[in-house]
Regions:
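Primary recognition of RNase H-like, Mg2+-dependent phosphodiesterase/nuclease domains
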Residues: 1-175
Length: 175
């Protein structure tokens, strides 16, 4: 049996981490549903206590690649934060490709390059902005939202709440 400290570290390694004040965190995720020829987008804005300010899901025609899907949802997440008039945000997703593309100083020539430029433009409108990459296990609520997108038609936004079946994942992360 592992010592308690190691077990605690294992638990910490797979849970959501809150942003540092004064930041709010936008977690996002995207997925392609090949069987239904659609893509799901999920994003959530949370505070330092894990409280939900807003969440969204969208079901769209699938872009060319999974990376394109992740870029579309990153853009939706940052636009949600902008629409909420947030001043300090962390944009966090599990696509290292997108994180690096947003952080890069040069223009992206990839199929999603225009969306990366738009994300950067929106990022400049915040007083404080950070971008963060996280393993999928630490992005489970956004991943659950993305899966829910399979069952919606178009964009759905919730203010200070999430779909009821997402609550168990949210509560597990808060534990």
């Amino acid at each position: 049996m592992k010592p308690v400290t190691e077990m605690a570290n294992l638990h910490t390694a797979v849970t959501w981490s809150p942003p540092q004040p004064p930041f709010l965190k936008i977690n996002y995720d995207g997925a392609v549903f090949w069987d239904s020829n659609s893509a799901g987008l999920g994003a959530m804005v949370r505070d330092i206590m894990g409280g939900v300010l807003a969440s969204l899901v969208d079901n769209i025609p699938p872009p060319q690649t999974v990376v394109d899907v992740e870029t579309v949802v990153a853009r939706k997440g940052i636009m949600l934060a902008r629409d909420l008039n947030l001043s300090s945000t962390v944009l966090e997703g599990d696509s290292e490709i997108i994180t690096r593309a947003i952080q890069a100083e040069e223009q992206s020539l990839a199929s999603y390059g225009n969306l990366i430029e738009e994300i950067r433009l929106h990022a400049d409108s915040f007083l404080n902005f950070r971008i963060s990459h996280v393993k999928i296990k630490r992005n489970s609520v956004a991943h659950s939202l993305t899966r829910h997108a399979r069952y919606v038609s178009g964009l759905v936004v919730w203010m200070e709440e999430v779909p009821s079946h997402i609550l168990p994942a949210l509560l597990t992360e808060a534990a």
